[in-house]
Design a protein with these regions (language model features):
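Generic N-terminal targeting/processing segments that precede catalytic cores or assembly contacts
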Residues: 4-61
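Non-transmembrane, aqueous-exposed alpha-helical and coiled segments at domain scale
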Residues: 5-16, 33, 65-72, 106, ...
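A short glycine/serine-rich beta->alpha loop
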Residues: 36-41, 62-63, 76-86, 126-131
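A structural-propensity feature for long, helix-poor, extended segments
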Residues: 107-152
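Phosphate-handling active-site elements
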Residues: 60-71, 100-116, 132, 153
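Conserved small/polar residues in nucleotide/adenosyl-binding loops
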Residues: 159-161
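Conserved phosphate/anionic-ligand binding catalytic regions in large, soluble enzymes, centered on
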Residues: 39-49, 82-95
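Short glycine/serine- and small hydrophobic-enriched flexible loop segments
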Residues: 51-61, 96-104, 143-150
Length: 161
């Protein structure tokens, strides 16, 4: 899945639209994702991800007119209460941290969004006390965050990251 992002400001409409598109991709590949997770874990991660995406989409009427920071905070709270367990706490931490560092209600460009994600991943890493190579979601999140961060540091356009 590739986010269809221009270099304009991101909005809650962007969050909702992409959550719906991600839901389709995840649902279409659920059995493959479950199989990969069974190789390194207990195979239930896909269900938590699907539940989390569904919760985000259900928030549409509540968050569509909110600032990005308030919308991300609503998402964090919904995920924390709706998923539960370690996945809920970790994904909730990701969105809560992104909400805290977004603090711009006028809009967020892709570089700010990337920095928000990078900070969120770092918070998840600290909370979960996990790193790359430990067969956790950090094996995906950290390399993605590093790649995005490197692209911003090199001042690459989003399409080139």
């Amino acid at each position: 899945y590739i986010f269809m992002v221009t270099e304009s400001l991101l909005s809650t409409d962007f969050l909702i639209k992409n959550a719906k598109e991600i839901q389709v991709v995840i649902d279409n590949n659920a059995s493959e994702i479950e199989k990969l997770d069974q190789e390194i874990g207990d195979g239930d991660h896909i269900f938590n991800v699907q539940r989390g995406i569904k919760l985000v989409i259900e928030l549409e009427p509540i968050i569509k007119h909110l600032s990005m920071s308030k919308a991300l905070n609503q998402i964090a709270m919904k995920i924390l209460s709706g998923i539960g367990g370690s996945s809920g706490a970790l994904f909730g931490t990701l969105f809560m941290t992104m909400a805290k560092v977004s603090n711009i209600d006028d809009g967020i460009d892709y570089k700010k969004a990337i920095n928000m994600f990078v900070d969120g991943v770092e918070a998840v890493k600290q909370r979960g006390k996990a790193d790359v190579g430990e067969k956790t979601m950090m094996d995906v999140l950290i390399p993605v965050a590093n790649c995005l961060k490197e692209g911003v540091e090199k001042d690459l356009s989003l399409i080139h990251i």
